[in-house]
């Protein structure tokens, strides 16, 4: 899964097939929240090699190792399985086929339970899911074309989360990534995940949420991408350090201040209870965690902080 120990390029250079085990905590949060997280993980797996992956494990009913063993509601098995296929999986596989009588996974969900018959709800839903997959057999091996990409670079994340400051009680990096991803998916836009060693060409828009560390010549890639007509969206706390986690001198985002038409001057970290607001284009937006103070130099201001302390603005250039 999309965890901090992974580095995409190291993985894809050494493997032939990408697979993963998908065990969402369905019914804990709103279904659309859980579904969005699962979709993001699927797209990350597909993006590793830009080709279909394998869903190696999924549970036909409930696990036994999560904090609460919640049964999948009727119809959810089929929906979750088809979601995996829609995001690039060439398989839907289960753990486990038959429940064991003993040991640590004897109560883990299975296609065939201790009763052993075929006349169960779970067996029926597995059968219906299999029939639906048979109807979709012709799309096996097909690839997904994405016009949008998100830069998720593990080395940048490692460095950022190991830094002392600016918010040691939680940077909420993955929440930021999910907000970007969720916005694109609500628009029906397919999304690839990239690291900084990959090319940006072929995309219409690329997002860089909290790209703290710059490496692999990313500054030049971004500059060329924008010059060729692409749209690049970068958030606060980006371009702060080099590949050795040494702070850049001369201003941030390093090497791109002219591209974005601004310079980040200060970053204010907010307590959990702190709330600021951004006002612009007739709307007000809630702001939490960080307020990046910027000095513009050619960028168009779209949103202004409501707090008098935060005197600069998010911009477009």
Predicted regions and their residues:
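Single conserved hydrophobic/aromatic residue that forms the stacking wall/gate
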Residues: 2-11, 309-317
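A general structural detector for well-ordered alpha-helical segments in enzyme core domains, enriched
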Residues: 14, 37-45, 76-80, 122, ...
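Aromatic/acidic polysaccharide-binding cleft in carbohydrate-active enzymes
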Residues: 22, 55-120, 145-167, 237, ...
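Aromatic-Pro/Gly-enriched surface loop or interdomain linker
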Residues: 119, 124-204
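A conserved amphipathic helix/loop scaffold
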Residues: 209-316
């Amino acid at each position: 899964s999309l965890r901090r120990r992974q580095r995409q390029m190291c993985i894809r250079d050494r493997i032939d097939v990408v697979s993963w085990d998908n065990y969402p905590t369905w019914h804990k949060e709103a279904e659309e929240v859980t579904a969005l997280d699962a979709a993001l993980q699927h797209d990350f797996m597909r993006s590793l090699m830009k080709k279909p992956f394998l869903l190696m494990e999924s549970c036909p009913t409930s696990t036994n190792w999560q904090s609460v063993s919640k049964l999948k509601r009727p119809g959810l098995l089929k929906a979750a399985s088809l979601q995996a296929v829609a995001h690039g999986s060439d398989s839907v596989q289960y753990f486990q086929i038959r429940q064991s009588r003993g040991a640590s996974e004897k109560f883990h969900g299975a296609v065939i339970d201790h009763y052993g018959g075929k006349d169960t709800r779970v067996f029926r839903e597995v059968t219906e899911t299999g029939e639906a997959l048979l109807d979709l057999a012709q799309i096996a091996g097909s690839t997904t074309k994405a016009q949008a990409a998100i830069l998720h670079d593990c080395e940048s994340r490692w460095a950022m989360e190991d830094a002392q400051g600016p918010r040691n009680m939680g940077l909420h990096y993955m929440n930021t990534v999910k907000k970007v991803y969720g916005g694109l998916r609500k628009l029906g836009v397919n999304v690839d995940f990239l690291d900084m060693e990959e090319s940006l060409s072929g995309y219409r828009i690329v997002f860089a949420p909290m790209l703290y560390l710059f490496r692999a010549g990313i500054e030049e890639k971004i500059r060329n991408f924008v010059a060729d007509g692409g749209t690049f969206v970068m958030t606060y706390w980006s371009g702060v350090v080099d590949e050795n986690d040494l702070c850049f001198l001369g201003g941030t985002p390093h090497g791109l201040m002219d591209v974005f038409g601004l310079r980040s001057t200060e970053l204010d970290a907010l307590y959990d209870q702190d709330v600021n607001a951004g006002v612009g284009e007739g709307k007000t937006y809630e702001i939490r965690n960080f307020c990046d103070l910027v000095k513009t130099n050619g960028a168009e201001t779209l949103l202004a902080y409501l707090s008098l302390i935060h005197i600069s603005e998010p911009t477009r250039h």
